[in-house]
């Protein structure tokens, strides 16, 4: 796995519905060059991304990596979300809190929203709805279009579960093979043995996910901030072609794109991770305040 250069603090914030969220914060030694709020995938959590977060911190960025409600260090309501708007509101509050901190200690530097895998779907919708909160959008192998999308029958079953009000019924996440995430045996073992990884989600979460799928289709005209997308060439989860086509339709006039042809889905675990982290750092270094 490799150790992070900088160790994070583990902190908490409480959203308007009283839910207590854990997050990891990496604080640089000097005045931050920028602030980056990160959103993880459906199964992962902030603890997977210590290396890249530490590298960004060493490069001068304050990194806040939030564990989604019901995921990672958040043990309450595992795998559950009552509504898609609740997940959006969680991110909005985290961004607002981060902007307050930015305004206090480094008011002229940008705030960037980073979403990876499933978190890229959530980040895209937030960027479309609340563009005044971010100066840049980072999408790492985002779950905009995947090879694991629900079939017609899956959607029928989900609708029936909704009608039966089985909102808290747990459904296994169909990504139970670590080989889907990385080709590195040590990292596969880490994923397999990680007790904080999410293995199941509720019907209510899947309904929220379905709504996010709909919202991402209409999001591109509303995403106007500078953006960067990074894909893994050997990704078996993300439909790279469809995702790239979606990305090209963004209203943003400043779009950077990278694809790492030898990498599997989770770039964090791949041998060339210093390459993509360096590319991301260079892009962040060129970002300017827009909001």
Q: Model segments located where?
A:
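N-terminal cap/lid segment of alpha/beta-hydrolase-fold proteins
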Residues: 1-28
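Short beta-strand element of the alpha/beta-hydrolase
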Residues: 33-41
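Catalytic nucleophile-loop/oxyanion-hole region of alpha/beta-hydrolase
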Residues: 43-46, 72-107
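Conserved alpha/beta-hydrolase
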Residues: 53-77
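Alpha/beta-hydrolase-fold enzymes
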Residues: 116-202
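Short beta-strand/loop motif that positions the catalytic acidic residue
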Residues: 223, 229-231, 235
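Short alpha-helix in the alpha/beta-hydrolase fold that links the catalytic acid
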Residues: 225, 239-248
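Catalytic active-site module of serine/aspartate enzymes centered on a nucleophile-bearing elbow/loop
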Residues: 256-291
């Amino acid at each position: 796995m490799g150790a992070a250069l900088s160790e994070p603090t583990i902190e908490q914030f409480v959203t308007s519905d009283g839910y207590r969220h854990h997050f990891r914060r990496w604080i640089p030694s000097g005045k931050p060059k920028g602030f980056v709020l990160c959103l993880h995938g459906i199964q992962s959590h902030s603890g997977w991304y210590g290396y890249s977060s530490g590298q960004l911190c060493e490069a001068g960025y304050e990194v806040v990596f939030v564990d989604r409600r019901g995921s990672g260090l958040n043990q309450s309501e595992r795998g559950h979300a009552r509504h898609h708007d609740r997940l959006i509101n969680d991110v909005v509050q985290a961004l607002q809190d981060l902007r307050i901190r930015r305004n206090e200690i480094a008011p002229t530097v940008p705030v960037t929203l980073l979403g990876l895998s499933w978190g890229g779907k959530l980040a895209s919708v937030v960027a479309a709805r609340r563009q005044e909160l971010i100066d840049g959008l980072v999408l790492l192998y985002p779950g905009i279009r995947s090879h694991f999308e629900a079939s017609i029958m899956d959607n029928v079953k989900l609708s029936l579960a909704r009608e039966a009000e089985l909102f808290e019924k747990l459904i296994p996440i169909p990504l139970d093979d670590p080989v889907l995430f990385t080709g590195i045996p040590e990292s596969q073992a880490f994923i397999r043995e990680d007790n904080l990884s999410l293995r199941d989600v509720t019907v209510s979460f899947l309904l929220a996910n379905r709504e996010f799928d709909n919202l991402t289709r209409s999001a591109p005209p509303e995403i106007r901030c500078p953006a960067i997308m990074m894909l893994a060439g050997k990704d078996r989860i993300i439909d790279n072609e469809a995702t790239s086509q979606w990305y090209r339709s963004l209203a943003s006039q400043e779009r950077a794109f990278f694809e790492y042809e030898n990498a599997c889905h989770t770039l964090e675990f791949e041998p060339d991770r210093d390459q993509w982290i360096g590319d991301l750092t260079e892009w962040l270094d060129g970002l300017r305040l827009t909001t």
